[in-house]
Amino acid sequence: MTEYKLALVGFGGVNRALAQLIAERNQQWKTELGFTLKIVGVTDLFLGSVMNRHGLDAASLARLPASKGAMAQLPGGTVDALNEAVIKDCGADIIAEATFTNPVDGEPATSFCRWALERGKHVVTTNKGPIALHGAELKALARCNNVAFEYEGSVMSGTPVIRLAKQALAGSSITGFEGILNGTSNFVLTAMEGGLGFAEAVSQAQALGYAEADPTADVEGHDVRLKVVILANELLDAKLTVNDVSCKGISALSLDDIEKARRDNARWKLIGAATRNADGSISASVEPRLLSNDHPLASISSATNAVSFTSELLGAVTVSGPGAGRTETAFALLSDIIHIHQSATRKQEHTL
């Protein structure tokens, strides 16, 4: 049995949900998967930091109030966000990074990942910024230090589209994909089909926790553009930057557009797509598309996400699932940790 020491960077909904999963299921993982997780450090810009090489109680962390400086309530805790110290010095084997996405330069999350990889620590993250903007550098750094850099949760939260495509569809020669990759925009479009105007639909999404106070990144397609870069670079061997992906959001769609689509047996969807062209180049875009009701993505409603992969051997393969949610995204971090453990186990068996 292996025990992995874990540091949580960012302690909002996702890493808090991961702490709750550890509290509830650690013994189950020991029996079923052959490992347990021990939290040895937590740092958060708002809550502060705490470190203990002997381990922190996961249940107590999960119950911690979401109030400024709350980490100071714990033995050894402080109101200060000691990000670098926690990442470098708490003795963690794995860093679970779940801070906010900065679509401009990927900071500070990119630095958090870089510090960990340079110190020979595995990194699992749900953050789109570091992968979309600095993915090649960070993957090279991970290889150089013989550690893993995993980011399954960066595209569709707990729905394992990256690993499914790379493993289950390996050898099928994926030539492109198109997907509904943002739950907020899809919720807004579904609400508009129910008669709400755009502004009302956005307000409802905010009230339900699907949309941020500033919904621009979601409804204007910027969030999806980062995900298209990640998927295209990972699955199509592209070298795209965000500037290579044309981007148009849904804010210009009116109720008249939605109603006309209904009469024509079609639905508007915000689609992120990339395709390998005959000359080997990659075309990528984010835009509202009018899909006929028999299209595999047309039936995807509310905050659900889906992606349809096109391959030479299988044609179209469509995967749908939750594209948001604290527990679902925390599961993506767990999935990455399981992958790290299984890879390490195979290496050990190979050397025996």
Swiss-Prot record:
The record lists the catalysed reaction(s) as: L-homoserine + NAD(+) = L-aspartate 4-semialdehyde + NADH + H(+)
Single GO term (MF): homoserine dehydrogenase activity
Read off the SUPFAM superfamilies from this record.
Glyceraldehyde-3-phosphate dehydrogenase-like, C-terminal domain, NAD(P)-binding Rossmann-fold domains
Chain segments annotated as transmembrane: none
Q: What is its EC number?
A: 1.1.1.3
Report the domain of life of the source organism.
Bacteria
The reply to whether Thylakoid figures as a keyword in the UniProt entry is no
Example GO biological process: threonine biosynthetic process
Induction profile:
Up-regulated upon growth on canavanine.
Q: Which InterPro entries match?
A: HDH_cat, HDH_CS, HDH_short, NAD(P)-bd_dom_sf
Q: Which UniProt keywords apply?
A: NAD, Oxidoreductase
A Pfam family per the record: Homoserine_dh
Q: Which family does it belong to?
A: Belongs to the homoserine dehydrogenase family.
Instruction: Briefly state the protein's biological role.
Output: Dehydrogenase involved in the degradation of canavanine, the delta-oxa-analog of arginine, allowing growth on canavanine as sole nitrogen and carbon source. Catalyzes the conversion of homoserine and NAD(+) to aspartate-semialdehyde and NADH. Is highly specific for NAD(+) and cannot use NADP(+).
Q: Which NCBIfam families match?
A: PRK06270.1, PRK06349.1
The name of this protein is NAD(+)-dependent homoserine dehydrogenase
Q: Which organism is it from?
A: Pseudomonas canavaninivorans
